[in-house]
Amino acid sequence: MASNHKSSAARPVSRGGVGLTGRPPSGIRPLSGNIRVATAMPPGTARPGSRGCPIGTGGVLSSQIKVAHRPVTQQGLTGMKTGTKGPQRQILDKSYYLGLLRSKISELTTEVNKLQKGIEMYNQENSVYLSYEKRAETLAVEIKELQGQLADYNMLVDKLNTNTEMEEVMNDYNMLKAQNDRETQSLDVIFTERQAKEKQIRSVEEEIEQEKQATDDIIKNMSFENQVKYLEMKTTNEKLLQELDTLQQQLDSQNMKKESLEAEIAHSQVKQEAVLLHEKLYELESHRDQMIAEDKSIGSPMEEREKLLKQIKDDNQEIASMERQLTDTKEKINQFIEEIRQLDMDLEEHQGEMNQKYKELKKREEHMDTFIETFEETKNQELKRKAQIEANIVALLEHCSRNINRIEQISSITNQELKMMQDDLNFKSTEVQKSQSTAQNLTSDIQRLQLDLQKMELLESKMTEEQHSLKSKIKQMTTDLEIYNDLPALKSSGEEKIKKLHQERMILSTHRNAFKKIMEKQNIEYEALKTQLQENETHSQLTNLERKWQHLEQNNFAMKEFIATKSQESDYQPIKKNVTKQIAEYNKTIVDALHSTSGN
């Protein structure tokens, strides 16, 4: 009994309440090496409700439980199972994994339902946001309409206060209507021009992209050194462009300041007069500085006289050298003319052979002239003739080559004919060479004569230009001498100019003081008008309406941003894609597992 009691205390009671004494019943399958243990499954993931599988809590083992008292751990590792209800699950088969997948699919469906509910909520909120946006747009339109009505009412109040008649109001209405029609027409024109410009911009952008692609291809085909140079030049270009942008911004700001100042000046006549006086003063000061610089640059009368005399001497030397060159050329021309006359006289004296030679030379000269005139035609004719002769020569050579094979069978008569043909060929070749040499000689003579003629024409043009320039210089020098000889008159005129400038300076200073006082008065009036305008109720109402309008625009912009962010947050498409992808992967794993189990 003691032993039995001890064994019953050592073994835990099974689910049926019956203790195991001795060996386990035949219904329990003993542990063996063929049992598959789910090592990949996490603790507590066994399908609930399966036979003999304990429900895992997923926690840590408590210190009170001992290994001897409990053969099954809470992490799912199976030991010796006891129970009267039959064998517990020892093998993780297909039904187990299907149960797990069903539980996961149910969890995924619940999550998808939750997401769909959230999407519906976001859609409802978006519809509310859209209604708010539409309401904001309608409110903005109403504000604009109310502003227009307010302006109309203010205009009517002004008209009533000024006691204007109905005819004037109708005239103003007609004028405004005509102006609006003109502006609508101009807007239509601007719209069409804008469309045309946009088309041009698109075409230009396409061309730019094509050019960029072409440049990229060129850069790729370049060598490494050229690519490095290109990159360096590109960086420098970018730096220069940045500097250009900054300078352009500075220039734009300066232009804006200039335009604002010009607008301020345009409204006040006093400022315009002040600007004109400042410009006049600047011109007078620059003229004064110029006169002072001239006075400083001008030395003593003796030095100026020496400079002028030196310049006159240099010019006289140049004139003398040019006159010498002119006389030399004239003498050469006269010599050539005399030689020609002597030749003419000699030719007239000598008759007979000399006269005939002279006539032949004249004819040759005429022939040369005609040849120069008809050079191109003769050249073409000679080239054609040359080509024809070459063709004839080729034909004769072919004929000769054909007849060479028959030399042995040909009699003495054929030898004579062959000699005749050779003589003809030699004669024709010599004629061709003579014609080529004559053509070359004629072309060289023509080129030489043309160069000589061009040189003579250049010399004549240079001589005429130098003559004109020297004559103009002489005239200017004579006028300068006449002016600078009268030194006391120059001094008196300079002193008179200085006195006039001093008087004008005094007058301008008095004007400046007066304008300063006027400016102070105008500023006081401006400040008074400003205070009156700030105290006016209509002005305050308009400012308040403008502030409200700005506030509504800011709210509208904030609502638009809020709508955009919420629409991005409610985008469930990536989550949906991820879920569908995971389901597909799980299905694939199930199919693979089924195939593997069926194969085993």
UniProtKB/Swiss-Prot annotation:
It comes from the Eukaryota. Keywords: Bardet-Biedl syndrome, Cell projection, Ciliopathy, Cilium, Cilium biogenesis/degradation, Coiled coil, Cytoplasmic vesicle, Developmental protein, Disease variant, Flagellum, Joubert syndrome, Methylation, Obesity, Phosphoprotein. Residues 1-90 are annotated as: Basic region. The modification Phosphothreonine is found at residue 73. The keyword Coiled coil applies. It is found in: Cell projection, Cilium; Cytoplasmic vesicle; Cell projection, Cilium, Flagellum; Cytoplasmic vesicle, Secretory vesicle, Acrosome. Residues 1-33 are annotated as: Disordered. Highly expressed in adult and fetal kidney and expressed at lower level in adult heart, placenta, lung, liver and pancreas, and in fetal heart, lung and liver. Little to no expression was detected in adult brain and skeletal muscle or in fetal brain, thymus and spleen. Detected in sperm (at protein level). The modification Omega-N-methylarginine is found at residue 51. Residues 561-600 are annotated as: Important for interaction with IFT27. Changing residue 86 to S: In SPGF58; affects subcellular location, instead of being homogenously distributed along the sperm flagellum, concentrates in the proximal part of the flagellum; also affects splicing. GO terms for molecular function: beta-tubulin binding; chromatin binding. Belongs to the IFT74 family. Component of the intraflagellar transport (IFT) complex B: together with IFT81, forms a tubulin-binding module that specifically mediates transport of tubulin within the cilium. Binds beta-tubulin via its basic region. Required for ciliogenesis. Essential for flagellogenesis during spermatogenesis. It is linked to Bardet-Biedl syndrome 22: A form of Bardet-Biedl syndrome, a syndrome characterized by usually severe pigmentary retinopathy, early-onset obesity, polydactyly, hypogenitalism, renal malformation and intellectual disability. Secondary features include diabetes mellitus, hypertension and congenital heart disease. Bardet-Biedl syndrome inheritance is autosomal recessive, but three mutated alleles (two at one locus, and a third at a second locus) may be required for clinical manifestation of some forms of the disease. This is Intraflagellar transport protein 74 homolog. It comes from Homo sapiens (Human). The gene is IFT74.
